């Protein structure tokens, strides 16, 4: 799903391309995709000289593949923008969200830039707007993550589960630990020793690295039976109180954000209506009733677009803009 989204995003944004090469596993090699009227065949990814002359390589093939082929991809000077978790916490690999820390992309000793986890990306875009006003000390976040975050096959399984339940048939469960249709699953990825899942710890560790901050993030990540776009309920504690008016203005003017906050008219972000959109949408902005330095708000973002392909392409656009590639 993310690979095809890359092609859509590159085309939508009129990304400057002299030549587009597609690489994949033996399963994908030989497939053909049309891009800007030209048919391109997927080549087999191998340890050879295929990346000679390549300026930017977008990789979204999983951590194992990224680690195995990183040297092959970068050895002739290509910038590898990697969507996997392989390098995110490596000290010599920048972890970049262009609305937050674009300049980090300029220091990449290994020629690799890491794309953060989808839930982290949309959260830090929103946090940055408030961090510009006053330092954020703590974050509590609960995520509501769509089925497609686990891949296209997982989304297909959710469709099939709904059909099976409504038809009174036995339910197929393969992509998730339990039936997702008519259910919520409070586990994404495996559990770690501290009782948090790897997904939840990504939000803690990645946020600190991206924001260059001592911010503490406590997350609960939940898989929900929505198809596309992740939602997050976020509570923050700031060093000084931030008024609702200040917060609304900051979100309205924030890079990559759209304010959608009119409770009287029942206007707030919802995943059903925001799939396929580029920005992160913010609504339900309130003062916290338990802490005078607290704010709470709700965000929705398309995890395949801003949470993956779009963020990577925006990193590349930044490098081109500042003439730091090619």
Language model region names:
Residues 149-152, 192-195, 226-229, 244-245:
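Short acidic/glycine-rich loop or secondary-structure boundary segments that cap or lie
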Residues 111-122, 195-204, 209, 307-311:
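A glycine-rich, Thr/Ser-enriched phosphate-binding loop motif common to dinucleotide/cofactor-binding enzymes
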């Amino acid at each position: 799903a993310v690979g095809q989204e890359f092609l859509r995003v590159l085309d939508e944004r009129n990304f400057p391309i002299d030549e587009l090469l597609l690489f994949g596993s033996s399963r994908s090699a030989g497939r053909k995709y049309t891009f800007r009227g030209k048919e391109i065949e997927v080549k087999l990814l191998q340890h050879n000289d295929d990346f000679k002359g390549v300026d930017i390589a977008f990789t979204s093939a999983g951590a194992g593949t990224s680690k195995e082929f990183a040297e092959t991809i970068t050895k002739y000077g290509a910038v590898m923008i990697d969507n996997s978790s392989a390098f995110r916490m490596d000290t010599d690999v920048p972890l970049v969200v262009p609305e937050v820390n674009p300049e980090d992309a300029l220091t990449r000793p290994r020629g690799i830039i890491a794309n953060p986890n989808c839930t982290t990306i949309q959260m830090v875009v929103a946090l940055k707007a408030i961090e510009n006003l006053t330092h954020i000390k703590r974050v509590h976040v609960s995520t509501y993550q769509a089925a497609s975050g686990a891949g296209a096959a997982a989304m297909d399984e959710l469709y099939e589960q709904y059909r099976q339940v409504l038809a009174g048939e036995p339910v197929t469960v393969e992509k998730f630990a339990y039936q997702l249709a008519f259910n919520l699953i409070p586990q994404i990825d495996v559990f770690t020793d501290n009782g948090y899942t790897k997904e939840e710890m990504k939000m803690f560790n990645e946020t600190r690295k991206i924001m260059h901050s001592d911010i503490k993030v406590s997350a609960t990540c939940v898989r929900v039976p929505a198809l596309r776009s992740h939602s997050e309920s976020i509570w923050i504690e700031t060093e000084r109180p931030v008024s609702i008016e200040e917060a609304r203005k900051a979100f309205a003017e924030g890079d990559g954000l759209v304010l959608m906050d009119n409770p009287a008219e029942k206007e707030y972000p919802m995943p059903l209506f925001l799939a396929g959109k580029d920005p992160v949408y913010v609504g339900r902005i309130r003062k916290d009733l338990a802490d005078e330095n607290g704010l709470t708000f709700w965000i929705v973002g398309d995890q395949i677009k801003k949470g993956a392909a779009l963020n990577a392409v925006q990193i590349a656009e930044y490098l081109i803009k500042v003439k730091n590639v090619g």
